[in-house]
Amino acid sequence: IYNDIIPWDDDVDVFITRKQLAELQQILQDDETFHVTVVWDWYVPCKQIRFKLRDEKNPTFIDLFPLDTITGNYSEAWNITSQARVDFVSDIRKKFTGTEWEKTPYLYDNSALAEQIEYVLDEHYRALSEKINFTDDLQTASGLVRGIENIDETHSSGPYPIDDWMPTINMRFDDFDVPAPPAWRKYLQNLYGDFLQIPHDIDSHEHVDNHYLQDDAVLASLEKYVNS
């Protein structure tokens, strides 16, 4: 219904359960075309997870945002997890200010320092697991919560009761179907208000540096992929 345009954002963000993310990473481990990259972003701060082509000349990507599945009171779990995100950010700011991460704001996961950040994340998840009940079983899950390594929301879009999200429905986009939560309209309105309007700050976004799009090798890679 959008004529192949997503008017409420200028990139593609996809929620994915933590179990599905692990499965995707396993599937793509030896894939020659695609892979999943991980970069720790100091500015936000967050764990930037992207589905990308292995061709480094092709700058296109899809952002992946992990969701955790939980049982019990989903509203309470949402509030507890939201506070856990605040605590996690405070902790990593305290521990890593003045380190390589601050000096090199985009830190790839093959860095020794990234291992330390992952350790801190694991510590916070262990503490969180004592307060809410995580599950990998979507059949028994009562809700979803955003991973504490995700970017901050401008305002809270939750809680996420499972029936609003699962099972997914197919929605047509261009010439293919994509899975979407049954309550998709509710959450787009929560986040963006009138999501059919172009965001007022759209010109300030630059997910891909413009100089890439002037590079002949980049343009050739994009054309090759689109025509493949």
Where are these regions (language model features)?
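Helix N-cap motif at beta-to-alpha junctions
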Residues: 18-21
